[in-house]
Amino acid sequence: VISSSLPLTDESAIFFCQDTDNVALFKFMVIPNEDTPYKFGCFVFDVYIPPNFPNEPPVVNHSTSRKNNFRFNPNLYACGKVCLSLLGTWSGQSASEKWIPPNTAGTGSTLFQVIMSIYSMVFSEDPWYNEPGRERSIENAKINAEALQYNKGVQNGTIKYAIINQLKYPEEGFEDVIKIHFSQKKEKVQQYLQELNKTTDLNTFNTLI
């Protein structure tokens, strides 16, 4: 049911891979929107469903961060930790942001909600502002400059680890999806790397594709 409800468009998508030996384990891969610094990247998450689910939240780990020791986002630690109040890994400002067990009102939290929160809220256009206490300000040039600089770092990490490395060492279970994704986006990725003057990465991409 979850896999059939996930977004699948020309610009972004989520793919689901169930562990055939253990129903409590699965992966999902996010291809973020192209208006974000994560464009064209393939980001994989490991999920464990605990015995007490849905009374307690699932355990989610960002495989792409963990394997490359790179922090893609204030919510995605280099160790793989996914920091979200919905997962109980961050203390949210209100009870509504936290995991809600099933109830008679039918307002309990769901696994689909977790996946979509990561897809839409974590992989945002300006991830620097995901850090609590950082607020957008048109008038504050220093803050805006820091956000732009952060985006450049995210772009570099995405190219190195979520594009090039995914072509070199595709995540198990998503090999075919990754291959098709980059084949379909070949010209767009090439143009993107050219615009960023990433000559070495462009040559590597052309060799791998």
Predicted regions: what they are:
Residues V1-F26:
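N-terminal leader/pro-regions and domain N-caps
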Residues V1, H62-I209:
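Domain-scale recognition of soluble eukaryotic interaction modules
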Residues K39, P54-P58, D126-P132:
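Short, solvent-exposed secondary-structure capping/transition elements
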Residues V23, F40, N55, Y77-C79:
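Short, solvent-exposed loop/turn segments at the edges of secondary structure
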Residues C17, M29-I31, N61-S63, S85:
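Residues in well-ordered beta-strands of folded domains
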